[in-house]
């Protein structure tokens, strides 16, 4: 079982796809990792030798921020924005979209379920 950065990679998938199970590694990053380490992207995770797994692990530890470190970094960045009172920080605090999307009709993912208000009698 290949275990990298505290994540068990799925055995039956190709290495290229298996690496994307690690938080902070997408498809393009996994392709770059495999190109640098010289491992065939079509190889299945179960077919990797221990030496190849160690190469991947070493490259990730030296060059990338993944999993807990990356999550902590993102959380600290958001916390900093909230503390300094920037526009983006205020949007985070209120639970609204941060990147300029309209909120009159959409933004249900960020705002949560619709809160209906009872109509006033005439």
Swiss-Prot record:
GO BP annotations, alphabetical order: translation
Region feature (Disordered): 93-122
PROSITE patterns cross-referenced by the UniProt entry: RIBOSOMAL_S13_1, RIBOSOMAL_S13_2
Coiled-coil annotated residue ranges, if any: none
Keyword Protein biosynthesis: no
Function comment: Located at the top of the head of the 30S subunit, it contacts several helices of the 16S rRNA. In the 70S ribosome it contacts the 23S rRNA (bridge B1a) and protein L5 of the 50S subunit (bridge B1b), connecting the 2 subunits; these bridges are implicated in subunit movement. Contacts the tRNAs in the A and P-sites.
Official protein name in the record: Small ribosomal subunit protein uS13
Organism: Clostridium beijerinckii (strain ATCC 51743 / NCIMB 8052)
């Amino acid at each position: 079982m290949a275990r990298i950065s505290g994540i068990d990679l799925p055995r039956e998938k190709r290495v290229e796809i298996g690496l994307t199970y690690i938080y902070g590694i997408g498809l393009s990053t996994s392709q770059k990792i495999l190109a640098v380490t010289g491992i065939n992207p079509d190889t299945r995770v179960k077919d990797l030798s221990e030496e190849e797994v160690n190469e991947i692990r070493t490259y990730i530890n030296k060059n990338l921020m993944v999993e807990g470190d990356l999550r902590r970094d993102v959380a600290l960045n958001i916390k900093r924005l909230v503390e300094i009172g920037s526009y983006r920080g205020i949007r985070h605090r209120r639970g609204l979209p941060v990147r300029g999307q309209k909120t009159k009709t959409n933004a249900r993912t960020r705002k949560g379920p619709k809160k209906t208000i009872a109509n006033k009698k005439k």
